[in-house]
């Protein structure tokens, strides 16, 4: 069957273009045009330190490293995600073009969480 439009996170297309799962994926991905809405939703990645962690200082150092340009690039490169703004992107991701993140905050997501779960349940998702 043919499909005119699909919605997918950009990093799946980037993985295909890079041939992570083989040459065939790369050939299919070359037929796809990535369009980014403006503004675009951004998946949230977060880290934290457990209240009773015995190694809090080391955990904080790890989080600080992951939030640094070097750590961000190390996280983003193999997964084809967008790194921090001041870090060079993977070329495939860079070729998708610039985007403006939407203004949704973590607080917004928390406020709408119960409604989202209700909608999913009402639609038959388990």
Task: Walk through the language-model features, giving the residues of each.
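An extracytoplasmic/periplasmic, membrane-proximal ligand-sensing/linker region
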Residues: 84-126
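Substrate/cofactor-recognition hotspot
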Residues: 62
């Amino acid at each position: 069957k043919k499909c005119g439009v699909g919605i997918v996170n950009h990093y799946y297309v980037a993985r295909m273009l890079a041939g992570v799962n083989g040459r065939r994926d790369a050939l299919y991905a070359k037929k796809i045009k990535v369009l980014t809405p403006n503004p675009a939703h951004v998946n949230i990645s977060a880290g934290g330190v457990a209240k009773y962690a015995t190694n809090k200082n080391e955990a904080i150092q790890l989080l600080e490293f992951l939030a640094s340009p070097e750590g961000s690039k190390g996280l983003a490169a193999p997964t084809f995600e967008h790194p921090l703004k001041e870090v060079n992107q993977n070329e495939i991701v860079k070729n998708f073009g610039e985007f403006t993140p939407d203004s949704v905050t973590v607080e917004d997501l928390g406020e709408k969480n119960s409604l989202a779960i209700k909608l999913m349940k009402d639609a038959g998702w388990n």
